Swiss-Prot record:
Protein localization: Cytoplasm
SMART domains reported in the protein's UniProt record: Iso_dh (SM01329)
Cofactor(s) it depends on: Mg(2+); Mn(2+)
Chain sites annotated for binding Mg(2+): D215, D239, D243
Binding site for substrate: R94, R104, R130, D215
Designated name of the protein: 3-isopropylmalate dehydrogenase
Entry EC no(s): 1.1.1.85
Gene: leuB
Matches recorded under InterPro entries: IsoCit/isopropylmalate_DH_CS, IsoPropMal-DH-like_dom, Isopropylmalate_DH
Catalytic activity: (2R,3S)-3-isopropylmalate + NAD(+) = 4-methyl-2-oxopentanoate + CO2 + NADH
Source organism superkingdom: Bacteria
Function summary: Catalyzes the oxidation of 3-carboxy-2-hydroxy-4-methylpentanoate (3-isopropylmalate) to 3-carboxy-4-methyl-2-oxopentanoate. The product decarboxylates to 4-methyl-2 oxopentanoate.
């Protein structure tokens, strides 16, 4: 297989974890005979420094012409007072790619379960599906004076149906349960959300549907996370709840994410930020970035075996006791990546009977 991947290293630790992504991709090429054209483009704060814009037109054009996009990290205090903010580029990139579904799998490795703030961390295995294009972030009018500020929350039927359908399709391949999170006891947009969700559910009779109000959901994520399979919710609620869920793994450096469009390339990135305090120190945890690569291989390219090989190698390295500093170890970004690549090679040799 031959695919073109745009690599947006971005800011902070982004360039370091992007090298880890490239490392496992090169190993996949060598072990399975694929070829990936990796194209580096400027994005975020570094793009502001070079071009004045966080998302140069050249970068967006390259992303649109690709088969998938990998993003390292974006932002940092260096650009706090700048006219253009790096994070603005991420919103523009999502809009330009037309991605509507943000997908965050939340699982806990047995080797690092003790780092989770929850006692029964081994029961955690769910996915948060967040709607990305509608809701309060993108609705108008918006206005502010010294005395009053107004935001608008709007959702259209087709936006709800699209994201909920995606969640049901995903759940049908997992444990066959969808939890829809809303505030239907108060918000008109949530009442429509619930109505449309129930209509979509009729097309998936083998998938269980439950509704939970967002405040109760925030509590249940901590009290009983094992009850969840696929969570689907609107933009603002998803933004907050997915961040809450991410800490259950014990480190932000562990979890990947994907953002999908109806057609065209998807965007894959770790959920962690740019971590400017450790940037350039070879301390960043590359697991979330490598898992984002695994998601890309499986979800965009159909290379499930290759994606699983990365996941299995990561698990094996963790079980061997090798960890980066954020999860209680002494491995560097580089040494942990090399260990995963070596494990991939060894597992492939075992699979082929040496």
């Amino acid at each position: 297989m031959e695919k073109r991947i745009v690599c947006l290293a971005g800011d902070g630790v982004g360039p370091e974890v992007m090298e880890s992504a490239k490392g496992v991709l090169h190993m996949v090429e060598r072990l399975y005979g694929h070829h990936f054209h990796l194209q580096d483009e400027h994005f975020g704060g570094v793009a502001i420094d070079l071009t004045g814009q966080p998302l140069p037109q050249r970068t967006l054009a390259a992303c649109l012409a690709s088969d998938a996009v990998l993003l390292g990290a974006v932002g940092g205090p260096r650009w706090d007072g700048a006219k253009e903010r790096p994070e603005k580029g991420l919103l523009a990139l999502r809009k330009g790619l037309g991605v509507f579904a943000n997908v965050r799998p939340v699982t806990v490795e047995s080797a690092t379960a003790h780092l989770s703030p929850l006692k029964k961390a081994d029961e955690i295995d769910f996915v948060v599906v967040r709607e990305l294009t509608g809701g309060i972030y993108f609705s108008y009018p918006k206005k502010r004076t010294d005395e009053v500020a107004t935001d608008t929350l709007t959702y259209h039927r087709h936006e709800i149906e699209r994201i909920v359908s995606y969640a049901f399709q995903l759940a049908s391949k997992r444990k066959k349960k969808v939890t829809s999170i809303d505030k239907a006891n108060v918000l008109e947009s949530s009442k429509l959300w619930r109505t449309v969700t129930e209509e979509v559910a009729l097309r998936y009779p083998d998938v269980e549907l439950e509704h939970i109000l967002v405040d109760a959901a925030a509590m249940e994520l901590i009290r009983n996370p094992g009850r969840f399979d696929v969570i689907v919710t609107e933009n603002l609620f998803g933004d907050i709840l997915s961040d809450e869920a991410s800490v259950l793994a014990g480190s932000l450096g562990m979890l990947p994410s994907a953002s999908h469009a109806e057609k065209g390339p998807s965007l894959y990135e770790p959920i962690h930020g740019s971590a400017p305090d450790i940037a350039g120190k070879n301390k960043a945890n590359p697991i979330a970035m490598m898992r984002s690569v695994a998601m890309m291989l499986g979800q965009s390219f159909g290379l499930t075996r290759e994606g699983c090989a990365i996941e299995e190698a990561i698990s094996a390295v963790l079980k061997s006791g090798k960890c980066t500093a954020d999860i209680g170890g002494a491995e560097t970004t580089t040494s942990f990546t090399k260990a995963v690549m070596q494990e991939m090679e060894e597992q492939a040799l075992v699979g082929r009977g040496r």
